[in-house]
Amino acid sequence: MNGIMSFKWKILFLGYCGVILYVSSLSPKGLPGGPALVSDKILHLCEYGLFGILAWGAFGVRKGVFPWGLVVLGAWFGIMDECWQDWIGKSRSADVWDAAADAVGSLLGVTVAQLFWIKR
C-alpha cells in the first residue's frame, strides 16, 4: 500500500475513533430510541469489528503475521471507552461485558481483514 493510501486509512481510522467517543458522550436520550431489536453486545461487537478492520487498514503488517498488537489496541480502546462513559456521567456507566464484546469484535475485525485483504 502506498504512503498516500496508508495516510488515508489512518485518517479514516482516527475519525472513526472520534465517532466512537462522540457517541459514547451522548446521554441515553441522545441515542436512537425504539425497542431494542438487537443486544447492545452485538452492537459493540460490530462497532469494534469495524474498528479492527480500519486499524488493520491503517497499521496492518504483511500477510502471514497476525497483528496481535491491533487486537490489544482495540481491547484497550474499548476499555478506555467504557471508562470515558463512566467518567462523563450522563446516566451512562461502564460495563465489563461491553468491554469484552469490544475486545472480541476487535479480534474478529482484525482476523477478517487479515484473511481477506491482500496487503503488500
What are these regions (language model features)?
Residues 18-22, 79, 83, 107:
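Alpha-helical transmembrane segments of multipass membrane proteins
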Residues 52, 70-74, 78, 102, ...:
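Small-residue faces within membrane-embedded alpha-helices
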Residues 1-57, 70, 74:
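"…centered on the first transmembrane helix and the immediately adjacent amphipathic helix/loop
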Residues 47-61, 92, 106-117:
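Membrane-interfacial alpha-helical segments at the cytosolic side of multi-pass membrane proteins
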Residues 59-81, 85:
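Membrane-embedded catalytic cores of phosphoryl/pyrophosphoryl-handling enzymes
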Residues 5-11, 62-69, 92-96:
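Membrane-helix interface segments
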Residues 2, 118-120:
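Short, charged juxtamembrane terminal tails flanking transmembrane helices
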Residues 30-39, 80-104:
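Interfacial helix-loop-helix junctions of multi-pass membrane proteins
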